[in-house]
């Protein structure tokens, strides 16, 4: 058993013991830590529960993140420790990209500034605060300004990350097709109700063509 599997099983036991909603679900499916010796046996709580129940191990929340609620009801993620959440996404970022200080980070997130409880907005705001400051920031629907910033960064060969919701990235690269050599594109989902739904491979091909890159990264 590797370290990841051991940690996963320990977390399953912790959630079972301290999370009343999750424990009830496991009991109803006749699964307990005594029955589980592999990560593939750990029960997955249906995501709809985050719309209908308070899913948490703690009685007090440091913050509550909410989904977009495109279907009418928002899902709620009760966070007991913001520092733990920050440690998680910062470590994930540095593992794949290095330090945010090494990049210009541009965020194309129309609609998110009006949603202060969005975890994506929280993460991007934190990373942007640590990034190089000249062009880093939120561009919302400012396609012309974003286009000029990307051109300037490409001309200076500056390492850049453009992170954005799917429909906005697609709208942008259709209006401003580019050939980017120093920019990483990260899509975060978010096509529902805004444009025709595409399978991931088809969507990524459109972004690759529009931005002139060989890979598209994802963050969900």
Regions found by a protein language model. Name each.
Residues 81-85, 116:
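Phosphate/oxyanion-binding active-site loops and adjacent basic polyanion-contact surfaces
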Residues 123:
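A glycine- and small-aliphatic-rich helix-loop capping segment at beta-alpha/alpha-beta transitions
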Residues 120:
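Residue(s) in the substrate-gating loop at a strand-loop-helix junction
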Residues 12, 75, 79, 110:
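Short, charged/polar micro-motifs that form catalytic or ligand-binding hotspots
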Residues 32, 46, 81, 127, ...:
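Poly-acidic low-complexity segments
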Residues 1-14, 18-21, 98-104, 111, ...:
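Active-site glycine/GP-rich loop and adjacent strand/helix microenvironment
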């Amino acid at each position: 058993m590797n370290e990841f599997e051991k940690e996963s099983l320990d977390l399953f036991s912790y959630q079972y013991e301290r999370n009343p909603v999750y424990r009830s679900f496991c009991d109803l499916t006749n699964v307990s830590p005594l029955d589980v010796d592999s990560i593939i046996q750990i029960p997955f709580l249906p995501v709809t529960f985050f719309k209908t129940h308070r899913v948490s191990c703690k009685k007090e929340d440091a913050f509550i993140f909410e989904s977009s609620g495109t279907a009418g009801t928002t899902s709620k993620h009760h966070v007991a420790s913001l520092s733990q959440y920050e440690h998680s996404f910062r470590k994930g970022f540095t593992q794949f990209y290095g330090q945010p200080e090494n990049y210009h980070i541009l965020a194309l997130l129309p609609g998110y500034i009006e949603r202060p409880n969005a975890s994506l907005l929280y993460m991007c705001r934190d990373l942007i605060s640590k990034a190089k400051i000249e062009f880093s920031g939120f561009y919302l629907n400012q396609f012309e300004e974003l286009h000029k910033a990307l051109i300037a960064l490409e001309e200076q060969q500056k390492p850049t990350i453009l992170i954005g919701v799917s429909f906005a990235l697609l709208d942008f690269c259709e209006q401003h097709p580019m050939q980017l050599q120093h920019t990483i594109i990260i899509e975060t989902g978010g096509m529902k109700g805004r444009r025709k739904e595409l399978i991931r491979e088809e969507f990524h091909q459109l972004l690759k063509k529009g931005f002139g890159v060989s890979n598209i990264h994802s963050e969900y």
